[in-house]
């Protein structure tokens, strides 16, 4: 049995131009809201692949850091810029020779003292 108050005041919905959620009913697929599920497996596979790739990259970085620590490629005390005090200490530790050791080196040398001076890029004739 119908409610008499509804039958007299409710408009007729038989019109074909019914609009639901701002869209014409005849233009939309009634399942358009759920169409994303059509490719759900492909989407999940793609996301899983991206997660595996991120994990792989993270492991690579971790291995690189461990290798760097193992080989001590980066030593902050050696590789970072030094303070002015450290540079001054190293400068003060340098010894200026009086030249006598240089003369000893020349006397004990096996080089030819009469040889022409080497100039890069200049070709000399056959000797």
UniProtKB/Swiss-Prot annotation:
Subunit structure and binding partners: Interacts with the second and third RRM domains and C-terminus regions of PABPC1 in a 2:1 stoichiometry.
Polar residues: compositionally biased ranges: 1-13
Location in the cell: Cytoplasm
Known tissue expression: Expressed at highest level in testis, but also abundant in brain, cervix, lung, ovary, placenta, adipose tissue, thymus and thyroid.
Region annotation PABPC1-interacting motif-1 (PAM1): where it falls in the sequence: 22-75
Keywords: Cytoplasm, Translation regulation, Ubl conjugation
Chain positions covered by the region annotation Disordered: 1-24
Biological processes annotated in GO: memory; negative regulation of translation; negative regulation of translational initiation; regulation of long-term synaptic potentiation; spermatogenesis; translation
Encoding gene (name): PAIP2
Domain of life where this protein originates: Eukaryota
Sequence segments annotated as region (PABPC1-interacting motif-2 (PAM2)): 105-120
GO cellular component, one term: cytoplasm
Annotated family: Belongs to the PAIP2 family.
Protein name: Polyadenylate-binding protein-interacting protein 2
Main localization, broad class: cytoplasm
Post-translational modifications reported in the UniProt record: Ubiquitinated, leading to its degradation by the proteasome.
Record comment regarding domains: Only the PABPC1-interacting motif-1 (PAM1) interferes with the binding of PABPC1 to poly(A) RNA and translation initiation.
MF annotations from Gene Ontology: mRNA binding; mRNA regulatory element binding translation repressor activity; translation repressor activity
Role played: Acts as a repressor in the regulation of translation initiation of poly(A)-containing mRNAs. Its inhibitory activity on translation is mediated via its action on PABPC1. Displaces the interaction of PABPC1 with poly(A) RNA and competes with PAIP1 for binding to PABPC1. Its association with PABPC1 results in disruption of the cytoplasmic poly(A) RNP structure organization.
Any one Pfam family match given in the protein's UniProt record, by short name: PAM2
Record InterPro entries: PAIP2-like, PAM2_motif
Species this protein is from: Homo sapiens (Human)
């Amino acid at each position: 049995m119908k409610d008499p108050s509804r039958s007299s005041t409710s408009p007729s919905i038989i019109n074909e131009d019914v609009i639901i959620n701002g869209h014409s009913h005849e233009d939309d697929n009634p399942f358009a809201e759920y169409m994303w599920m059509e490719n759900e497996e492909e989407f999940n596979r793609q996301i899983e692949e991206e997660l595996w790739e991120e994990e792989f990259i993270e492991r690579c970085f971790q291995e690189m850091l461990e290798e760097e620590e193992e080989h001590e490629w980066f030593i902050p005390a050696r590789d970072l810029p030094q303070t002015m005090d450290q540079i001054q200490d190293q400068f003060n530790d340098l010894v200026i020779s009086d030249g006598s050791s240089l003369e000893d080196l020349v006397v004990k040398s096996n080089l030819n003292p009469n040889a022409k001076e080497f100039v890069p890029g200049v070709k000399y004739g056959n000797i």
